Amino acid sequence: MDIDLLWSFGGWFFILFPETINYCMAKLRSTSQISHFTNPRSCSSLFFVALLIITILITMLQSSTSMEVTSLPTHQPTSSNSHDESSTSSTATTTTDLHPKRTHHQSHPKPTRSFEAGAHEVPSGPNPISNR
């Protein structure tokens, strides 16, 4: 097992649990090569930094979802029940054009011009230039 590969994929268990080093294929000459967290402040500071990063990520995700919810049109309740269902359904199905300057293209455009294939001279023979 390659030790560099373990470090790149989170080999922190070697630092936290030094007895797991015995399960590696390569044996270390001494245990002094491994740095241990002897200072409890460094462990707690790493914990708080990780907690801060997770908190920031969660707030960013919540703010992006709340922006999506507020950008959706809301249905206003009508004050009177005299409106028919078609008028309320037409207001509920309105959409917002996100790109107002873009023109809408048809998926299959109608052919507006026809190719003018009138009568024309067709050369005959293997070499049309010499047939003139």
From Swiss-Prot:
GO molecular function ontology, one term from the record: receptor serine/threonine kinase binding
Keyword Ribonucleoprotein, does the record have it? no
Query: Whose protein is this, by species?
Result: Zinnia elegans
Which positions bear Hydroxyproline? 123, 126
Key words, A-Z: Cell membrane, Developmental protein, Differentiation, Glycoprotein, Hydroxylation, Membrane, Secreted, Signal, Transmembrane, Transmembrane helix
**UniProt record similarity statement:** Belongs to the CLV3/ESR signal peptide family.
In which residue ranges is the amino acid composition biased (Basic residues)?
A: 101-111
Q: What is the effect of changing residue 120 to A?
A: Impaired repression of tracheary element differentiation
Q: Name one GO biological process term.
A: cell-cell signaling involved in cell fate commitment
Cysteine pairs bridged by disulfides in the record: none
- From the UniProt record, report the name of the gene that encodes this protein: TDIF
Question: Which stretches does the entry tag as region Disordered?
Answer: 68-132
Which residues lie in Polar residues bias regions?
A: 68-77
Q: Which GO terms describe its cellular component?
A: apoplast; plasma membrane
Q: Which residues cross the membrane?
A: 42-62
- Asked if the keyword Signal belongs to this entry, the reply reads yes
Please report the name of this protein according to its UniProt entry: CLAVATA3/ESR (CLE)-related protein TDIF
Composition-biased stretches (Low complexity): 87-96
Range of residues in the leader sequence = 1-26
How the protein is affected by changing residue 127 to A?
A: Impaired repression of tracheary element differentiation
- Residues linked to a glycan: 126
